[in-house]
Curated annotation (Swiss-Prot):
Keywords: Cytoplasm, Methyltransferase, Nucleotide biosynthesis, Transferase
Protein name: Thymidylate synthase
KW Lyase (keyword) present: no
Residues that bind dUMP: 21, 126-127, 166-169, 177, 207-209
Listed pathway(s): Pyrimidine metabolism; dTTP biosynthesis
Organism phylogeny: Bacteria, Pseudomonadati, Bacteroidota, Bacteroidia, Bacteroidales
Enzyme class name: transferase
Known function: Catalyzes the reductive methylation of 2'-deoxyuridine-5'-monophosphate (dUMP) to 2'-deoxythymidine-5'-monophosphate (dTMP) while utilizing 5,10-methylenetetrahydrofolate (mTHF) as the methyl donor and reductant in the reaction, yielding dihydrofolate (DHF) as a by-product. This enzymatic reaction provides an intracellular de novo source of dTMP, an essential precursor for DNA biosynthesis.
Subcellular location(s) per record: Cytoplasm
One Pfam short name: Thymidylat_synt
Originating gene: thyA
One cellular component (GO) term of this entry: cytosol
Coarse class of the protein's main subcellular location: cytoplasm
MF (Gene Ontology): thymidylate synthase activity
Cytoplasm found in the keyword field: yes
Amino acid sequence: MKQYLDLLNRILTEGVHKEDRTGTGTISVFGHQMRFNLEEGFPLVTTKKLHLKSIIHELLWFLQGDTNVKYLQDNGVRIWNEWADANGDLGHIYGYQWRSWPDYNGGFIDQISEAIETIKHNPDSRRIIVSAWNVADLNNMNLPPCHAFFQFYVANGRLSLQLYQRSADTFLGVPFNIASYALLLQMVAQVTGLQTGDFVHTLGDTHIYTNHLEQVKLQLSREPRPLPQMKINPDIKDIFSFKYEDFELVNYDPWPHIAGKVSV
C-alpha cells in the first residue's frame, strides 16, 4: 500500500514536533488524503501483519450499537480495554451515535439505517452522512471519536465512502481504520445492490508518536506485497445480520507483526 507508506514518509519529512494529551509527544502534519480503489484489492497493510479479527469484531460491535467491551473481550479483542470503566462501559461512543443519536423530541435516530435507506431510494443525495461527533455528548464519551464522520456517494452503480478522521495515530490506528471503513463500504455496497467504489480517507492531525519512530522506519524498509481480497457471504442482505464467519480474507501475505505501545 504505497499510499500509506507515502504518508509515513511525509510525516517524517515534513512533520513538526507537538505535545499531546497523552504526554508521549508526536511528529505531526495537518491535512492528508488517501484514495483506495477496492477493485484493486482489499487495503490491508502488508508491511506488517494486522490482527484482522479485531478489525472485523470491532466493526460488527459498532454496527450493533454496543458500547460495552464484553462482546469484544468474549471474542479475544482487547483494543478498547484501556478506555473502559470498571463495568466495561465506554459511554456514548461510536456505536451509540451511529445507531441511537438523540433527537430533540426524546427519541433516537438510527443513522446507519437511514443511510442505507437513502442509498437505496435517493442515491444522488448529498446528505448520506453518518456522524459520531456529537458535540453535546462529548463529555459522555470515554474517548471522543477520532474517525468523526463519513459520507457515501453513488455514481455509475458504484458506492464510494469518504471518512474524515480528526486525529490519526498513523502507526497503530490508521491501518485499522483503513481496513475497517473499506470493509464497511463492501458490506453496505452488498446490501444496497451496488458495486464497490473508492474508499477516500481524509485525515486532520496526522501524527506518528515519538515512541513509534523506530517501528515506522522498520516498516518503511519493507517492500509492499500484493493486496489480499476480502470475500463476503453473498447471502447477507441486511447490514445488521453479518457475523464474523461471513468474512474470508484470501491471499494475505504480510511481513511480520511490529509491536507498538498505545498512548492513552
